Swiss-Prot record:
All copies of domain LCN-type CS-alpha/beta, residue ranges: 2-32
Role, per record: Alpha toxins bind voltage-independently at site-3 of sodium channels (Nav) and inhibit the inactivation of the activated channels, thereby blocking neuronal transmission. This toxin dose-dependently delays inactivation of voltage-gated sodium channels (Nav) (EC(50)=0.91 uM), and shifts the steady-state activation and inactivation to hyperpolarized direction. In addition, it dose-dependently alters calcium dynamics and increases phosphorylation of MAP kinases 1/3 (MAPK1/MAPK3) and cAMP-response element binding (CREB) proteins in neocortical neurons.
Protein's recorded name: Sodium channel neurotoxin BmK NT2
GO annotation, cellular component aspect: extracellular region
Stated family: Belongs to the long (4 C-C) scorpion toxin superfamily. Sodium channel inhibitor family. Alpha subfamily.
A molecular-function term among this protein's GO annotations: sodium channel inhibitor activity
Domain comment quoted from the record: Has the structural arrangement of an alpha-helix connected to antiparallel beta-sheets by disulfide bonds (CS-alpha/beta).
Species of provenance: Olivierus martensii (Manchurian scorpion)
UniProt keyword annotation of Disulfide bond present: yes
Amino acid sequence: VRDAYIAKPENCVYHCAGNEGCNNLCTCNGAT
């Protein structure tokens, strides 16, 4: 569920703000 949430680009930016590793994970999950 959490992965599906962060895979959405708008959610990823909010959830991963300032967290490069998390942003990279989101990108791998299909977010832009």
